[in-house]
Amino acid sequence: MNKSFHLLTVFNVRITFTPLCVVTYLILIPPFTWLGMTLRNLTLAEGLIASFFIIVLMFITENIHQLGHAWAAKSVGYPMIGIRHFSWFSASIYPKDEPPLPPQTHIKRALGGFWINLLIGLALAPFAFYLWNINGVAAFTVVATSAWNFFVLGLGALLPIDFNGFTVDGGTILHYWKEMNRDKMKG
């Protein structure tokens, strides 16, 4: 399941996905459908439609998050070459021959994505609050998309998670911040 498929290229960034990515998104359909039916009194059909829109928007906003990293990477002179979707989340791909970079460069690149999703979540929040008392596909979709962007891709991206095979932006920032401070202590 490590094979990647090319989806498209945006701003010279190649976007790929794995079969596991498709599976993990599809796995979200039953819980989102259940939540829509339970919390918003959606019918089964409405829950399925809302779930479809939610997972499509999750995928799109994950790409927007990564394109924020691509913009930051380009601005520091060491651009990204790809985005690899391996589950609900994705990884920034950099050239294999990239030279060792100073910690500040890694930190600037890691800071490129979260703020976009905070803004998306905040921009959708008034609509989410307004629509919360209105049942329907649009209401549930907007509420879920606002929450996903603000809490997961925005604030969640800043958590200092860094363990084998899974590092989020906050983990990268903490790792290179410690490295930067070690270098200062030596000097």
Report residues per predicted region.
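Hydrophobic transmembrane alpha-helices and their immediate loop junctions
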Residues: M1-G187
